[in-house]
From Swiss-Prot:
GO terms for biological process: protein quality control for misfolded or incompletely synthesized proteins; rescue of stalled ribosome. GO terms for molecular function: peptidyl-tRNA hydrolase activity; tRNA binding. Its main location: cytoplasm. CDD domains: PTH. The record marks 9 as: Discriminates between blocked and unblocked aminoacyl-tRNA. TRNA binds at residues 14, 64, 66, 112. This is Peptidyl-tRNA hydrolase. It comes from the Bacteria. It is found in: Cytoplasm. Gene3D superfamilies: Peptidyl-tRNA hydrolase. Its EC number is 3.1.1.29.
Length: 186
């Protein structure tokens, strides 16, 4: 089984914020692949289904971002899922809005959700970095906790990620990125 983790903060007040773009992708994948309704488990909202030929558990930690690692550790430990079979979808202020990059391992670039996951399971999991841009002025935390100006474009990108997710899960990272870029340009 694969573990697909969408990072975000719980609560309606954070629903449309840049920091919750991982939740948007997780919800979109769950809908697009007809996963059952999310249930509370492992300090998270969890749903298990299939993404193409891949059995997958989608996890949305119910803790705040800086404690996401606890939920990931619980789910991964219970199902004996190694870090290499975990993919985390998260906001990245170092990328322009709408840019998507994928990598395995590496540093957390100051992202508290990734820092928490690194401390819990190590850093060899996959990361799908979802660009939210940096503010021209003001604090970064204020920026990522503010709402998107164009939430429709975020939802469109989430659907493109979902539509091409089997490429990524099949190990074709370049094909996945190529399709996202091509689709996103249209």
């Amino acid at each position: 089984m694969l573990l697909l983790v969408g990072l975000g903060n719980p609560g309606k007040q954070y629903e449309f914020t840049r920091h919750n773009v991982g939740f948007v992708v997780a919800d979109t994948v769950a809908r697009d692949f007809d996963f059952p309704e999310f249930s509370s488990k492992y300090d998270a909202l969890v749903s298990v289904g299939n993404v193409g030929l891949h059995r997958a558990m989608i996890v949305k930690p119910a803790t705040f971002m800086n404690r996401s690692g606890a939920a990931v550790l619980k789910a991964a430990s219970m199902h004996k899922i190694p870090a290499e079979q975990i993919t985390v979808f998260h906001d990245d202020a170092d990328l322009q809005h709408g840019v998507v990059k994928v990598k395995q391992g590496g540093g957390n670039a100051g992202h508290n959700g990734l820092r928490s996951i690194d401390a819990a399971i190590g850093c060899q999991y996959w990361r799908v970095r979802l660009g939210v841009g940096r503010p021209d002025a003001g604090s970064l935390s204020g920026h990522v906790l503010s709402d998107f100006h164009d939430f429709d474009s975020v939802q469109q990108l989430a659907h493109k990620i979902s539509a091409n997710l089997t490429e990524l899960l099949d190990g074709n990272v370049n094909g996945f990125i190529s399709k996202i870029r091509c689709d996103h340009a249209q």
